[in-house]
């Protein structure tokens, strides 16, 4: 199942539902071109495509000359409270002309009412997702990650119970189409009983304000996120003692930058 989307509650539900029936999610960056999306659909021979409505036209073009049979379309409004959903639809009207093979998300969910929820037996070697490398050593490559990969990560963190407790919060600012975003930002916190705060499309300039608003004990990001926090004037003289574990990955962090961030955290 190829998924072209940012992180939304629907994409998280889809991850677990697909895994339970033995399917694999092929996660694709929604910023990719028609050609790029087409290549990744072909790579795994997807028969089902799931995409955001804002990238539907690109996905429709990309699905031509592939084995895609059905397209499930998500809207950012699907998870919003009614008043906010109406506001979103008024300010961002959906002008797509959908083909006959399209199923809207809510229609898809309604169609499953009363159906069997029997799951496949657990298979630790089942590939739950396919993500793609950055292409730094050539063309991007698909990487299959198993259920065991995801569960091993969660169990490693669970073993350190001095830091991680049920009921804490993790702010997920990472996209779903990188392994880091899904494994550390979704599966890990849910296994540990955390509340996950989803930021689907992060504006880096607002990161400090989001941290102050939600006060998450945990966050996973890249080094530049923490350098930005350390330099954010909105955080000056603020109490950030709620922070327990803010981790960086995905890129290198110079010794000087690491010291700057650590000094900032120690001072707050």
Residue ranges and their predicted role:
Residues 1-32, 44, 173-175:
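Conserved AMP-binding/adenylate-forming
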Residues 34, 42, 54, 60-100, ...:
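Conserved adenylate-forming
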Residues 95-132, 139, 162-169:
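Conserved pre-ATP/AMP-binding loop-to-beta segment of ANL
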